[in-house]
């Protein structure tokens, strides 16, 4: 049931990446584990259901020590915020790795206030295969005037890292 060396259950072995670098049993969602690899994070239930996210999909992760809760927000607003509650013995290595991996996936970022009054937020992100891509998020539906500023933001971000169109 468990790997001897680190007490990671065998059901956490990923067919693509092998055993996670670190993992921890969690209180909520019930009967689940959070596991992290250099390329991704997964919430895995004891029944074998997997919810996997590559690091570039994650906008931010924050730790509330009073609640013992890790809150993960995603770039895609359609993906519900993930709240992971730990028992009293939270895995500090796992928390550090989540933070470091999310930060590593963000190469650079910039913001621009748009003519419509909304804001565009852009960043160059890194996939697990080390390829780079642009993410642009806009706080409201862009107007025609906004589109020019958004294109300028994307161009500036690409120039920062030498990324072609």
Feature map (PLM): residue ranges:
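Eukaryotic intrinsically disordered, low-complexity regulatory linkers and tails enriched in Ser/Thr/Pro
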Residues: 1-165
């Amino acid at each position: 049931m468990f790997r001897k060396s680190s007490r990671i259950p065998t059901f956490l072995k990923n067919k693509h990446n092998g055993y996670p670098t670190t993992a921890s049993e969690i209180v909520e969602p019930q009967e689940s584990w959070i596991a992290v690899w250099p390329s991704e994070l997964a919430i895995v239930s004891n029944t074998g259901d997997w919810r996997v996210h590559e690091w570039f999909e994650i906008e931010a992760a924050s730790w509330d020590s009073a609640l013992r809760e890790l809150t993960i927000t995603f770039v895609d607003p359609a993906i519900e915020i993930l709240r992971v509650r730990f028992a009293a013995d939270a895995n500090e290595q796992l928390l550090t790795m989540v933070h470091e991996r999310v930060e590593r996936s963000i190469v650079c970022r910039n913001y621009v206030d748009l003519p419509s009054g909304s804001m565009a937020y852009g960043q160059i992100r890194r996939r697990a295969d080390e390829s780079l891509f642009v993410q642009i998020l806009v706080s409201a539906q862009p107007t025609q005037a906004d589109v020019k500023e958004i294109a300028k933001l994307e161009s500036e971000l690409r120039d920062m890292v030498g990324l072609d169109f």
